[in-house]
Regions:
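N-terminal Rossmann-like or analogous alpha/beta NTP/dinucleotide-binding catalytic cores
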Residues: 1-125
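Active-site cores that bind ATP or allylic diphosphates and position pyrophosphate for catalysis
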Residues: 99-209
Length: 209
């Protein structure tokens, strides 16, 4: 793919650990793949801190992750990316999804939501909140952003397929409320994207191969 100019002859991989602990053997394997491919094919690896959960991130672990990556001998072009660099873009993407009826705000309690997702042998049931007008969802998402609700009171879900054989694809949560100051953005945000929502957007922005 690199030789076909699909990526403009610039191969980019990424290593995106969450700075909530020290790197372990699983991280080392992932780093070996991302860093190794970049090195083998003359590309570059992005070191990106997955700081989407303000309750768990720690500056000490960010520092230690960088030191361990350097100690293992992998190049990251002396630049550290952060998921939080893209919070504004992710928020706009989420709003665009709502406008296109691809996401909705849900006030269903967590336990009930899990129950309504169904099982491996039964389809899930979509929340009644999903049937509200798009204008309602945009307004409630704005209320979430403005700190009107407590943690866990509601969330934003992607409108996918409640009959999917993969339960994780049954309208997954893509934004949740966390009224905890962020290590980099302080109190600028009180809603945060989930891992599965954030990473494809980050990869797209950084032009990861």
């Amino acid at each position: 793919e690199n030789n076909s100019n699909l990526w403009n002859n610039e191969l980019i991989t990424r290593f995106p650990p969450e700075p909530n602990g020290l790197l372990h053997i699983g991280h080392a394997k992932a780093l070996g793949v991302s860093g190794g491919i970049a090195e083998k094919f003359g590309g570059k690896m992005h070191l990106r801190m997955d700081d989407t959960n303000p309750e768990k991130e720690d500056a000490y672990f960010m520092k230690m992750i960088i030191e361990i990556v350097e100690w293992l001998g992998y190049e990251y072009n002396n630049h550290v990316f952060h998921a939080s660099d893209y919070f504004a873009t992710m928020h706009e993407v989420a709003k665009k999804m709502i406008e296109n009826d691809l996401a909705y705000v849900d006030f269903t309690p967590k336990e009930k939501m899990s129950e309504m997702r169904g099982t491996l042998t039964s389809f899930g049931i979509r929340s009644l909140d999903s049937h509200n007008p798009i204008s309602w969802h945009l307004s409630e998402f704005e209320n979430m952003k403005n700190g009107l609700y407590l943690d866990g009171y509601c969330c934003l879900r992607a409108k996918l397929d409640m009959s999917s054989s993969n339960i994780n694809m049954r309208d997954p949560v893509i934004y949740r409320i966390k009224n905890t100051p962020h290590i980099r953005t302080a109190n600028e945000w009180c809603i945060y994207p989930t891992y599965d929502f954030a990473h494809p957007i980050e990869d797209w922005i950084e032009k990861v191969s």
